[in-house]
Amino acid sequence: MIKNSKTLWQKASKIIPGGNGLLSKRPERFLPDGWPAYFRKSKGVFIWDLDNNKYIDMSLMGIGTSVLGYNNSFINKFVKKKIDEGVNTTLNCTEEYFLAKELLKIDKFADQIKFARGGGEAMSLAVRLARSKTNKSKIIFSGYHGWHDWYLAANLQDVSNLNNHLLKNLKPLGVPKILKNSAIPLEFNNLKELIKISKQKNIAAIVVEPSRFKYLDKKFVNYLNKICKKKKIILIIDEITSGWRECLGGVYKKIGLHPDVVVYGKALGNGFAISALVGKKKVMDTAQDTFVSSVAW
């Protein structure tokens, strides 16, 4: 039934570590030997695999990216137009400015925007800016925030620290040991733990997801807002998964969080690679003081 997919996956696994670039799309995480690894085409909620089997995607819709459906004709019309005009030149594209203006209308707390490609690199950038602004090192986090060193550093202290978000007992190989104790995990909605951890010194930022199966509760949110304001800790809201799914912009508005920076990804591009940091000028301006630059941004 899925012969062509299985054959290609076996070949790919020999020349690509893990078979592909994204852990969440590997067949063994769903149904080993029974999950179609590849798609041939897609439209709306439907996917066709290499053996021409047709499926309704009741899973993650592109790992949370395609809230407007696959292969959206309205979006494709504008993308194709831009491709025909030219995509990347020595000069800047005007769309960067116009999209920034539109996002600032939605996130009224913010003054400035910085774009990136994937959610993980956008989170890494947000953490860099927080550390740059505060001249402090520690990051308290609650949620899944990518694969970069700042995040995996949590497992330098205890290999189980990221068990709720990544592979069990993941050894952070390749992450400099000097980063030990720089990333402090915080259990989702655990107010007592937040009160205890926030007493530490040298905290640059607290990073949270506003929802993960459920919302942060009111007492947690109120204390988080209060302690960040009191201790001048940068509050970063990771809306990469939650953003644009329930409301225009981020869930943080619905539950009363007062962010300094909000990070969007996934659904922002409906399958096209784009992410954004939306934040207050006092934080975003530090991008001029620390080097952040990419030809693909």
Where are these predicted regions, by residue range?
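Conserved N-terminal phosphate-binding loop of PLP-dependent enzymes in the Aspartate aminotransferase
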Residues: 1-297
